[in-house]
Design a protein with these regions (language model features):
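FNR/FR-type flavoprotein reductase catalytic core
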Residues: 83-244
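Non-heme iron-sulfur electron-transfer modules
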Residues: 256-280
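Local cysteine-cluster metal-coordination motifs and their immediate loop/turn environment
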Residues: 216, 240-265
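Short, charged beta-turn/beta-strand-edge "cap" motif at the junction between a beta-strand
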Residues: 56-58, 101-106, 279
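Ferredoxin-reductase
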Residues: 2-95, 154
Length: 280
């Protein structure tokens, strides 16, 4: 976890600076902490998250969707699926929210230097992977080949589509897209991300994999990666589905004695592989 002296139990005021459609039913919400000193202290790693409060309604955890190195705003991908997110959708630029964080542990990017990176993103699970991609691109010579596998149920649910050309314009970066159900004008793969893994057959040599998506996707992606030669110690996952309080108090994200919100949400799969059947 990045060093911070922020109060992790009380929210800090933040103002919405931008809201835009990211995909069908998903918005990208950008906020800036009101206190300049709090902004300076809000240092985080790719993969960490924060609790976003809608005052008078409640709070929910969201993965940070932008790199801390790219300015003093925070971005979150919000899927309209519950009371808090419905109220977030009603807010606009200039409205205030509360922010608690940064929370959890992120990806140890320093450990990945010199490695080839294979990224697997499913649906809105691509949002916490965007700062990973940004970090690799901003420090391109520190990392080897970057391969991105991006999946969604349908083309209109793919996130950050306007950035794909920018990502792949960088040296030694390739991207493969797949959807469960293609539209007539779809020009990429159709099917599950597991089929895409088997199709491109990524080499496990000197490679780290990073995966975020629905739990069922993570489960079968891990099985498929093993099938093509990867071992659990090469695979990193972020597990966000059951988090609530963010500080290990409510117990909702307890998985076999492991608290996802405090010990994760990022894990080397080697640590959580015994809970594979829980990934549903």
């Amino acid at each position: 976890m990045a060093e911070t002296s922020l109060n992790l139990t009380d929210p800090n005021l933040a103002t919405i600076t931008s809201m835009r459609d990211l995909a069908a039913g998903i918005k990208l919400v950008q906020v800036r902490l009101d206190d300049p000193e709090e902004r300076k202290r809000f240092v985080y790693e790719p993969g960490q998250f924060a609790e976003v409060s809608v005052f008078g309604v409640g709070e929910s955890p969201f993965g940070l969707a932008s790199s801390a190195e790219r300015g003093d705003t925070l971005e979150f991908a919000v899927n309209k699926v519950g009371t808090v997110t419905e109220e977030l959708f009603r807010l606009d630029v200039g409205d205030q929210v509360g922010i608690r964080g940064p929370l959890g542990h992120g990806f140890p990017m320093h450990e990945f230097k010199g490695k080839d990176i294979l990224i697997l993103g499913g649906g809105i699970g691509g949002a916490p992977l965007r700062p990973v991609i940004q970090t690799i691109l901003d420090h391109r010579t520190d990392y080897g080949k970057l391969t991105i596998l991006w999946a969604a149920r349908s083309p209109d649910l793919l996130v950050f589509t306007e950035e794909y050309d920018l990502w792949t314009s960088e040296p030694n970066v390739t991207m493969h897209l797949t959807v469960d159900k293609a539209t007539p004008d779809w020009q990429h793969d159709e099917g599950l991300i597991t089929a895409l893994i088997e199709k491109i057959k990524p080499s496990p040599e000197n490679t780290i994999t990073i995966t975020c998506g629905p739990p069922i996707m993570i489960k079968f992606a891990m099985l498929t990666l093993e099938k093509v030669g990867f071992i659990p110690g090469q695979n990193w996952v972020t597990l966000e589905a059951k988090m609530k309080c963010g500080i290990g108090k409510c117990g909702r994200c307890n998985m076999g004695g492991v608290f996802i919100c405090t010990e994760g949400p990022v894990f080397c799969f080697e640590k959580v592989s015994q809970f594979l059947e829980s990934f549903v």
